[in-house]
Amino acid sequence: MIDLKFLRENPDAVRASQRSRGEDPALVDALLDADAARRAAVSAADNLRAEQKAASKKVGKASPEERPALLTRAKELAEQVKAAEAAQADADRTFTAAHMAISNVVIEGVPAGGEDCFAVLDVVGEPRAIDDPKDHLELGEALGLIDMERGAKVAGSRFYFLTGRGALLQLGLMQLAVRLATDNGFTLVIPPVLVRPEVMAGTGFLGAHADEVYRLESDDMYLVGTSEVPLAGYHADEIIDLSAGPRRYAGWSSCFRREAGSYGKDTRGIIRVHQFDKVEGFIYCKPEDAAAEHDRLLGWQREMLALIEVPYRVIDVAAGDLGSSAARKYDCEAWVPTQQTYRELTSTSNCTTFQARRLSTRYRDENGKPQIAATLNGTLATTRWLVAILENHQQPDGSVRVPAALVPFVGTEVLEP
């Protein structure tokens, strides 16, 4: 959630952020009103409790003649306090709902507008000229790497089996990402893939896109769509030590997404699926270090993309395409020959203090005072990367060249029918 002090002092900046996202700026005024009403309700309840306490003291010291009137007043005050506390609870609920409804304030320079309003920051590599390219599914099936038919038989649409060297290719990607992360000071974590509602809400995934999340109703638990979620909850309600620098974690997990809003999109192959594996970088740092950490995360993603040897571009994602928690997001998109376009392989988001404020994750400043930490996240490898590898490294005879960095994991330089 956003910083209330910042909101009170800069309401126009928050309204502008809402507009750049395509969201309702009137929510800012609703929150300001709810904040004022909550503070008034707290003050009223506090004043009545103080009066009640003073009246109780008077009763103990009162003469027999004074006592009946004082007892009557004490009873009235008890009822008034009860009503004031109920009003305060109502005001708190209204305030919390209004606070949770506002997305993070976007960072200056983020392009305004929707999905197509991104800014291209860099383009790396030239797409190969491939005559009559095969798509990743045709290649994957011919090479015995991907089995969508049996995936659908077992689990339904958008599920699949990775088999043989297809499974080795994915495992190799994950291990490359783990190696890069641990070489750069990340702590490897294999987290739970089920989380409590307060953790899912704290990361910002139960807002407008709550229907994208799998929920186990009988247990009131959620399946994660990224290990960002459990890693954000890892230090919830804690004061962490950042005196030696940022805390960096790399989470390796299976991820689950309903893709409820994607009917008819990417129905072929493994570009958009319900289950996939991912290595996710997650960082806790001081707010003043967040921009530099964001650049570092992007740099590590680019190192990974260099290892799989595919053309890609880096974009500054438009405000209207950001998740509610992100203040800025960079995507790296790989060239997909059969689609003649770039598709997202990685994203990295600077969530500033938005998630940590919801989850009460703090650190101590140089004066020992607790402050809200900043959080960042970024993909280091995921199943979708197989799409870019297979399509960009396909050969005229239907084989696929294995990027050199993955050869030790796959056991061959060429995947052949």
From Swiss-Prot:
InterPro entries to which the protein is assigned, alphabetical: aa-tRNA-synt_IIb, aa-tRNA-synth_II, aa-tRNA-synth_II/BPL/LPL, Ser-tRNA-ligase_type_1, Ser-tRNA-synth_1_N, SerRS_1_N_sf, SerRS_core, tRNA-bd_arm
Chief location: cytoplasm
Any single Gene Ontology cellular-component annotation: cytoplasm
Chain positions recorded as L-serine binding sites: T226, S227, E228, E280, T379
Catalytic activity: tRNA(Ser) + L-serine + ATP = L-seryl-tRNA(Ser) + AMP + diphosphate + H(+); tRNA(Sec) + L-serine + ATP = L-seryl-tRNA(Sec) + AMP + diphosphate + H(+)
Pathway entry: Aminoacyl-tRNA biosynthesis; selenocysteinyl-tRNA(Sec) biosynthesis; L-seryl-tRNA(Sec) from L-serine and tRNA(Sec): step 1/1
A Pfam family this chain is assigned to: tRNA-synt_2b
A GO molecular-function descriptor: ATP binding
Enzyme Commission number: 6.1.1.11
Sequence positions that bind ATP: R257, R258, E259, V273, E344, L345, T346, S347
Record GO biological process: selenocysteine biosynthetic process; seryl-tRNA aminoacylation
Subcellular location: Cytoplasm
Keywords: Aminoacyl-tRNA synthetase, ATP-binding, Cytoplasm, Ligase, Nucleotide-binding, Protein biosynthesis
Ligase found in the keyword field: yes
Domain notes for this protein: Consists of two distinct domains, a catalytic core and a N-terminal extension that is involved in tRNA binding.
Protein family: Belongs to the class-II aminoacyl-tRNA synthetase family. Type-1 seryl-tRNA synthetase subfamily.
Function (record text): Catalyzes the attachment of serine to tRNA(Ser). Is also able to aminoacylate tRNA(Sec) with serine, to form the misacylated tRNA L-seryl-tRNA(Sec), which will be further converted into selenocysteinyl-tRNA(Sec).
Assembly and interaction partners: Homodimer. The tRNA molecule binds across the dimer.
NCBIfam families on file: serS (TIGR00414)
Protein name as annotated: Serine--tRNA ligase
